[in-house]
Regions:
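Conserved short alpha-helical segments that host acidic/polar catalytic motifs at enzyme active sites
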Residues: 1-259
Length: 259
């Protein structure tokens, strides 16, 4: 009740009503059933997106992802959750702002990073996606516009490509990272200094510290590699992201209802 299907001709064109919500959830909790914690977190965030749902988990050495079109209760059953083992999890419910409602656009998105694997869940919109895609093309020769046309067509795919490329090479060709830092308002940050002085290949942590100041727009991100959970939001906090403390870990979510 209250849900309507997208029309068959749904595309990236502007629509008559805003479509700007998604729900993200992440948890790092050794000894806990993180896939079920994430399931219930996403269930509490279901109002933020009804097109697809997904969960990625890591046991410290391998990331598994399960996602599909539909509601949280339709996508996951006991068997699916039992197969998602580990102590770190990232989850997502989607309400499209860009890209068609296809399996390829369901999140979390899984991709490579230097020496590791990345699972990424994203809420929001980037306003400089074209510039970022051009910088990726100038650095690696990879034409993201063609790749996105064949499959995923979201900002999330661009973010995943950026994190992978910067982790491997350390920087983007022709990109003024110093200007990004000044614009971001980040100053006197020893961790950021370490990220920019580290030689490539970079950890996901250091790659993220270089990539995040490049982003323009409103966004919140929850992502992980095999051993660490990360979370970030735009400097103005336009897209919500809250932090919660567990007895032996941490959780992040789009809303406190999920905590």
């Amino acid at each position: 009740p209250g849900l309507t299907a997208l029309p068959d001709d749904h595309s990236d064109e502007l629509e008559p009503s805003p479509r700007e919500e998604c729900g993200v959830f992440g948890v790092w909790a050794p000894g806990e059933d993180v896939s079920r914690l994430t399931y219930f977190g996403l269930y509490a965030l279901q109002h933020r997106g009804q097109e697809s749902a997904g969960i990625a988990t890591s046991n410290g050495s391998q990331i598994l992802v399960y996602k599909d079109l539909g509601l949280v209760s339709q996508v996951f059953d006991d068997q699916a959750l039992s197969n998602l083992t580990g102590h770190i999890a990232v989850g997502h419910v989607r309400y499209a702002t860009q890209g068609a409602t296809t399996w390829e656009n369901a999140q979390p998105m899984l991709g490579p990073a230097a020496g590791s694997t990345l699972a990424l869940a994203h809420n929001g919109n980037l306003t400089n996606t074209r510039e970022l895609m051009d910088a990726v093309h100038a650095t690696s020769g990879e034409d993201l516009s063609g790749e996105l046309g064949r499959g995923s067509s979201t900002d999330t795919a661009v973010l995943a490509a950026l994190l992978n490329l910067v982790s491997e090479r350390g920087a983007l060709e022709g990109w003024d990272s110093a200007a990004d830092i000044l614009t971001s308002g980040i100053t006197d940050d020893a961790d950021l200094d370490a990220a920019y002085s580290a030689p490539a290949p970079l950890s996901v942590h250091h790659a993220a510290r270089r990539v995040l100041p490049m982003l323009r727009g409103a966004f919140s991100l929850v992502f992980m590699d095999e051993g660490t959970l990360y979370a970030a939001r735009d400097p103005h906090g336009v897209r919500p992201l809250v932090l919660g403390r567990l007895g032996n870990g941490w959780a992040v979510a789009s809303e406190t209802a999920a905590l």
